[in-house]
Amino acid sequence: MKFVLLFGVLLVTLFSYSSAEMFDDFDQADEDELLSLIEKEEARAEECTPRFYDCSHDRHSCCRSELFKDVCTCFYPEGGDNEVCTCQQPKHLKYMEKAAGKAKKFGGKIKKWFG
């Protein structure tokens, strides 16, 4: 009985040690991957395409507005066969930003009155 108990304790100890090393390896891999993604995002953020500029070279390069990212919208001009792509803000997002701005302004007034 003592042998089985000793063997069980040894087995649990080895299992916990191996799983701890495995989790450390996963954490390190996740951390390295996260850092590389952050670096790529920062590099891409510096090279964003402003609103109403051509985004045909990279359709995911549009800049962010205050709350939302602009969208690369492509269309064919009247009487033309060439596709033109520009970074634009969809109207529903434009209205949502205006509403959020007004709510923020109104919240500031309430805070000023009662603050």
Swiss-Prot record:
User: What Pfam families would the database entry show?
Assistant: Toxin_35
**Which Cys pairs does UniProt list as disulfide-bonded?**
48-63, 55-72, 62-87, 74-85
Name the propeptide positions: 21-44
The protein's superkingdom reads Eukaryota
State where it is primarily located. secreted
Gene Ontology molecular function, alphabetical: toxin activity
As given in the record, the signal peptide range reads 1-20
InterPro entries in the record, alphabetically? Spider_toxin_CSTX_knottin (IPR019553), Spider_toxin_CSTX_Knottin_CS (IPR011142)
State the UniProt keywords alphabetically.
Disulfide bond, Knottin, Secreted, Signal, Toxin
Location of this chain's protein in the cell: Secreted
The domain comment in this protein's record states:
The presence of a 'disulfide through disulfide knot' structurally defines this protein as a knottin.
Q: What is this protein called?
A: U3-lycotoxin-Ls1p
Naturally occurring in which organism (per UniProt) = Lycosa singoriensis
